[in-house]
Amino acid sequence: MGAGATGLRGARLSPEERANSSKSRAIDRALSKDHTDDLNRFKILLLGTAESGKSTIFKQMRVLHLDGYAKEDALEYLSIIHSNCMEALTQLVDACTAFGINHDITVQEDVNRFEDFKRKLRDPEGLVIPVVIGRCMDRVWHSPSLQLCYDTRRFRFALLDSAKYFMDNIVRLTEDNYVPSIQDIVHCRISTTGINELAFNYKKMDFKMVDVGGQRSERRKWIHCFDNVDMILFIVSMSDYDQLDPEDNKYNRMKQSYEIFKTIVHSDLFRHASIVLFLNKYDVFVEKLKTSPLRRSFKNYEGDNSEESAREFIKKLFRRCITDRHKFFVFETTATDTGNIDLVFGSAVAHIVNENLRSAGLHE
């Protein structure tokens, strides 16, 4: 009995001890919660050169993981979409002239009407294409001369990636009371300037995605986003393999992307970050290979001109930069395809979570 009483007395805690124990448990819970929050909070830095499709990925995250675009938000893209339509048709008409492709009389009249509308534009920033000009643009687009130029020479001159999408839909896009759809917004091209952030929840995890401009003048801003990055999402345009940098036409655009990627992954700032590479515009890459062999731009490429061989060469090119293969993941993407981006982003997150658990000894 005495021994039992002693045991009981030894198990009792004074009020101070009970208070300290309660406080200790509260601290443990708080630390555990902070640790859990840290595991569940991902900062993604979205990087890539101009026109890689980086901002399209950013828009897709809003579509997939937030509420998309309300009517008033969508209407802010109307002038941008109409500007893209004007740019696309201008590029095609100019290419016809450059390649000596002549229009028949009625098409030339529509081309003249289109050019006259451009000359009279007073406010390009607030551009709205009238219905009658939209119909005119549609006739020019469907003319034999424009179709010949597009079908046989579209990879031989600068052309907006979404030119076909916008031209195929020009009548709808210029109707009265037109409100841009999600796909219209996803396809539109606008240069990113400054730093844009998007916070969203996915698979019970909180994400913050940071998008900065890809133009050379914007890259100096990247350093301001480098704190506490969990994942670098680097976007490379696969279709750039035979393109020169418009800001400095001495440099191949894909080789330039490679050099920037190498600098990023070798930086001490990102030694703990996972690296995800999106090889974007894969659909355009496959089409281009039919008329522009990879070996023409990469002299050290010894494979054939098949999609599989060319793709693996480019993958290996970027993979050579990586020292920790466990933290590197690569996917082929088409940024304008919402389903594709949903699938590959989900796969990337799953790989990273599993790797983090493995590194922590919590997963085989």
UniProtKB/Swiss-Prot annotation:
Q: Fetch the PROSITE patterns from UniProt.
A: G_ALPHA
Protein's job: Guanine nucleotide-binding proteins (G proteins) are involved as modulators or transducers in various transmembrane signaling systems.
Molecular function terms from GO: G protein-coupled receptor binding; G-protein beta/gamma-subunit complex binding; GTP binding; GTPase activity; metal ion binding
The ranges of region (G1 motif) come to: 43-56
- Report disulfide bridges, numbered on this chain: none
Q: Does the keyword Transcription apply?
A: no
Lipid-substituted positions (N-myristoyl glycine): G2
Which positions are annotated as binding Mg(2+)? S55, T192
Q: Where is this region: G3 motif?
A: 207-216
Give the family from UniProt: Belongs to the G-alpha family.
Provide the residue span(s) of the region labelled G4 motif: 276-283
Write out the entry's keywords from A to Z: GTP-binding, Lipoprotein, Magnesium, Metal-binding, Myristate, Nucleotide-binding, Transducer
Give GO terms for biological process.
adenylate cyclase-modulating G protein-coupled receptor signaling pathway
The protein's name: Guanine nucleotide-binding protein alpha-6 subunit
Q: Where is the G-alpha domain?
A: 40-363
Segments for region (Disordered): 1-29
Residues where GTP binds = 48-55, 186-192, 211-215, 280-283, 335
Organism whose genome encodes this protein: Caenorhabditis elegans
Gene Ontology terms: cellular component: axon; cytoplasm; heterotrimeric G-protein complex; neuronal cell body
